[in-house]
Amino acid sequence: AIRLARGVTGRDKIVKVEGGYHGHHDEVMISNKPSLDEAGPAHAPHSVPQSGGIPHGVVEDVRVVPFNDSDALECALAPGDVACFIVEPVMENIGICLPDDGYLEKVRDITQRHGTLLIFDEVKTGITAGFGGATNQLGVRPDLITLAKSIGGGFPVGAFGGKAEYMNHITDGSVLHLG
């Protein structure tokens, strides 16, 4: 999903939420659980690699914001160089953390104004939150969505999808996706 967002927008940088977990690839193994010494100020967290071996350039391409802080997201997107904002609409890897009323609507508005794709990570909430996942339950439509555990029924499976205008970049071969 992140590669697709980068291919569609022509931008390299991404924004994620501090404490958000989106798998074990370099771009998202940033600030999953940074030490308090490394985390930086609460309103402007630092991008902290969670493992050795993550290239410095990757860390520089990831900005981190606090969950439920739309002002911080606005600042992170202001330079106009961000391909996507990836977020769990309901954060579950730090406990069940619901979005504040109006937060996701603000996120949708901010990302649209900045030409940044909004990716909902519904690996856990995709079906478990109800029909249509948290996306349907909370009423905010992302550009792309990732699914896995919630659709697997115990089997290791992953998927992503989204609006045709973005997914067509895979169909026409301008963005490669295999696997």
Regions found by a protein language model. Give the residues of each.
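Conserved N-terminal phosphate-binding loop of PLP-dependent enzymes in the Aspartate aminotransferase
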Residues: I2-G179
